[in-house]
């Protein structure tokens, strides 16, 4: 399941583009239940890094834990495990949100006149361009009208791909 490119993309978003998160997930898959300390040693990662990744995965409901108190030290020990049964739902929800965001972006692109700075390549809406006197806020260069037809086509293509994936992929049935 972790080899699916859509799942990988969603996991990267969840993990903040930290590729070590995949290693943590693989360790959880291989070892079933494991402590953060064991993951840290196995992957040669700082314990703090492993914990941050586990918390991100926990917030996304992709891992779960048990907490046990050591009676001698009064410290808590956490045993983590992957909960991949929730992964398709998490991915589907994120894809549906992405679809909503893309449709909103498409609406803006189709209904707004844009300008850009040829030097900085910053893009401005018509209202922003007026506010700046048709000058770039970064380099003071003269703004030119921006043809966003390619942007619109790209967004429409992304929407089509996501809609098809949601409709056809058995993972999301």
From Swiss-Prot:
Gene Ontology terms for molecular function: DNA binding
**InterPro entries cross-referenced by the UniProt entry:** TF_E_archaea (IPR016481), TFE (IPR039997), TFIIE/TFIIEa_HTH (IPR017919), TFIIE_asu (IPR002853), TFIIEa/SarR/Rpc3_HTH_dom (IPR024550), WH-like_DNA-bd_sf (IPR036388), WH_DNA-bd_sf (IPR036390)
Gene3D superfamilies named among the record's database cross-references = Winged helix-like DNA-binding domain superfamily/Winged helix DNA-binding domain (1.10.10.10)
Would the keyword DNA repair be found if you checked this record's keyword annotation? no
The HTH TFE/IIEalpha-type domain extends over: 3-88
Keywords for the protein's UniProt record, in alphabetical order: DNA-binding, Transcription, Transcription regulation
Task: Tell me if Transcription is a UniProt keyword of this record.
Answer: yes
Lineage top rank: taxon: Archaea
Listed PROSITE patterns: HTH_TFE_IIE
GO terms, biological process: regulation of DNA-templated transcription; transcription initiation at RNA polymerase II promoter
Free-text note regarding domains: The winged helix domain is involved in binding to DNA in the preinitiation complex.
Assembly and partners are described as: Monomer. Interaction with RNA polymerase subunits RpoF and RpoE is necessary for Tfe stimulatory transcription activity. Able to interact with Tbp and RNA polymerase in the absence of DNA promoter. Interacts both with the preinitiation and elongation complexes.
Instruction: Give the protein family.
Output: Belongs to the TFE family.
Which NCBIfam families does this entry report, sorted A to Z? Answer: PRK06266.1 (NF004910), transcription factor E (TIGR00373)
Purpose: Transcription factor that plays a role in the activation of archaeal genes transcribed by RNA polymerase. Facilitates transcription initiation by enhancing TATA-box recognition by TATA-box-binding protein (Tbp), and transcription factor B (Tfb) and RNA polymerase recruitment. Not absolutely required for transcription in vitro, but particularly important in cases where Tbp or Tfb function is not optimal. It dynamically alters the nucleic acid-binding properties of RNA polymerases by stabilizing the initiation complex and destabilizing elongation complexes.
Name the UniProt record assigns to this protein: Transcription factor E
Q: Which organism is it from?
A: Methanococcus aeolicus (strain ATCC BAA-1280 / DSM 17508 / OCM 812 / Nankai-3)
Q: Gene encoding this chain?
A: tfe
